């Protein structure tokens, strides 16, 4: 009679057919039945079930981390991405604003340099007239107790007006100087409304002008006099 465990004959006859016994299933300690006569082990919690899968029991449930829809990074990556985009946009805006401020500052500095260069050239031309060998002067008392002096150089064909003690013009008005071309008034520039003492290089050549006058005009000046002169002076002839 064959063995009930390995299904092999009891004899050792060479004519017997040997068959390999089916190996018993391997069982882990938690799945292996207890030896006869031993106390039954206390039931274990479900999470402590077989970890090898030998008895068909599933592995303990592992909590899964949720991932964003795009599958990149841990949960909340979308929110982080939005904050990153906002921060990047703020940096770009700040850089653009800084660039605009830098351009404005550069323009202001350039304008200041141009004004300084223009004032320097104006002072140089004024000095050339005052120091010219043929420069002639004429002085006169002006309205309100002010004093005026005009300097003319025929070689430079230019004239300079020096004022001291000039009262300020009315609000919104300026003093405008005119060449007197045989009765026709030709604009020769504006005086500084904030300066009581001023030196003005008259705009344009003297040519045939015989004198000059000063009127009160709207801010920015006028193409021709709009008020009576507050001062009239003749140019020196000798």
Swiss-Prot record:
It comes from the Bacteria. One of its GO terms (biological process) is regulation of translation. The lineage of its organism: Bacteria, Bacillati, Actinomycetota, Actinomycetes, Kitasatosporales. Residues 16-31 have a biased composition (Low complexity). Residues 1-51, 214-238 are annotated as: Disordered. GO terms for cellular component: plasma membrane. GO terms for molecular function: sigma factor antagonist activity. This is Uncharacterized protein in phr 5'region. Pfam families: RskA_C (PF10099). It comes from Streptomyces griseus.
